Amino acid sequence: MLKKVNRHLKSKIGKSTQAYAIPDLWTKGVHDLETLQFTKSGEALTDPYAFYSALIEKHFLNTEKKSATPLSNRKKHHAVGGDWLKESIIYSSMVRTSAAWDNDRSGFLEEKNRFGFKETGTFLKMIALLPSLKDMGIDTLYMLPIMVYSTKHKKGELGSPYGVNDFFKLDDSLKDDLLSESFTVEDEFKAFVDAAHTIGIRIVIDIIPRTNGIDSELIRDHPDWFYWIKASEKHKYKTPYVDAFSEAKAPLPKRMKTVYESEDVKRHIHMFEHNPKAQDETLFESIKESPDILDAIERHFDLTTAPAFSDNINDPPPPWSDVTFFRRYMDHPKETRTYLKDPDIPPYIL
């Protein structure tokens, strides 16, 4: 895939701006590229197609370096505890920020700049970081969420990558405008992984099963994997407060009796409802393929997914309007079920 990407980049050299700004750190190994003009501000101006092509050829194509050593060849791989991780030097990265740059020097990071290119990070831009990471001794790159995420009730302009909408699709915003529509975001991710493996860097992906987007695609087939409240009561939904504690506390088992005696906790637990499929399976099946599944459920069932919030008791921040918790168990916690008057109450977040 790297060769295919490089062929496309080479075909576009000379057909774009010569003032595409990049940090000079990215130019390692290609400092002598004719199209590079270095500035006093630590940047270089260049033809983006010429730069990325030269970078790929220098570090990833014209090389005799071996790819990342298979884990099966690691002497300690089969020992208890994941020894390959213990030996690794790991760098954590969020693509859209780690590889972001003000490429047109406008003073703003733009989703589409005056050259027609996005300035947030992409898999292609991440390739430019790999040589420097390798020089730092990094041999494992831990990728924070790269899946499609929800933008419903998003916080900020872009939304949270921790509000995953679909665990089986990559985030299209990580595709680079420099590559044509003949390349998918999956193709560009493959090229990035190929590049990393070529210089001995492994890729680890953060799957984050704890949280989901409030309108996760999994709702269509597994509404019972989520927590539900009445949509008409969402404005009343808030983090419960336990008067017996004057400050935030860790949710330890020894404190649970006091927590469940709190009137506000009782109010909170009673807000939860059974999932829409459990309430009316026929109706749910008739709407499950709606373009906006959560909107359809809110209209037909007056239900919505319960926003997540901090685990700590009396933690001040409000609920997170853009993410919901993924239900990991099909029963109530054994440490707290003794405090429930009705063991058959709907699943709840606390």
Located regions from the model:
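Acidic/aromatic-lined carbohydrate-recognition and catalytic surfaces
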Residues: M1-L350
